[in-house]
Amino acid sequence: MGLRVAALYDVHANLPALEAVLAEVEDAGVDLVVFGGDLVWGPWPGETLDCAEALGERACFLRGNCETLLLDGLSERHRWARDRLRPEQRTRAAAWPLTLSLDVDGLGSTLFCHATPRSADEILTPASSEERWADALAATEERVLVCGHTHLQFDREVGGVRVVNPGSVGAPTRRPAAWWAVLGPEVELRATDYDTEGAIAAASARVPDVRPFARWLRDTPSDDERLADFEAAT
């Protein structure tokens, strides 16, 4: 019998959002929690990783594009977040894999990655062409793929592969909430409400500039707006 898995992607160090989701995860009866990348870049880097790692062996971690940017310290915001991870946390984050394959109850062999199986920063959305999807999935043996990166929650089939994006826990699309998914035996797309204004107030006391974080939660783009931005960039 396969596993029942919670997929938590793009937390972006939004600790209040993660705590709200984990309270529901405990009631969901899952065997594993997969953190699908872009976990530690945001207002609460070290605290967010501590919270996730408190799950012990039930937690699995993937490296997203923001982990690479953060650890490389390519911008002031990335360096700020990096410096709020303890050295041993940075070492562990640098070692997170890019992909993970699990046997999920009812779904079978399922591949988890941050963006696509071949890249942690490739942009593919529901509006992307079948040809682009087929090219990105050409080497994928699994018939179910769980990916994030775009913060767009969806469940679709492309060329015989079921593609699930759980959405973003910490930087939402559609409405201010924490978006995630449970897999096994079905795919359950979920959204958890929490006190977003309280999160902004708490973040303002610790980050140099709270405005980007506040925009994530107050000026939440629609799916169409996010799609238009991504497709214009590809």
Where are these regions (language model features)?
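Acidic, His/Gly-rich catalytic cores of divalent-metal-dependent hydrolytic chemistry
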Residues: 157-234
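Beta-strand-turn-beta hairpins that frame and shape the catalytic cleft
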Residues: 1-6, 101-111, 158-162, 186-187
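Anionic-ligand binding region
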Residues: 127-166, 178-180
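Core catalytic region of metal-dependent phosphoesterases/phosphodiesterases
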Residues: 2-94
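Glycine-rich phosphate-binding loop signature in dinucleotide/nucleotide-binding domains
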Residues: 25-30, 55, 104-106, 138-141, ...
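Active-site-proximal segments of metal-dependent phosphoesterases and phosphodiesterases across multiple
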Residues: 75-79, 106-140
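Active-site environment of divalent metal-dependent phosphoester hydrolases
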Residues: 12-17, 41-44, 66-72, 120, ...
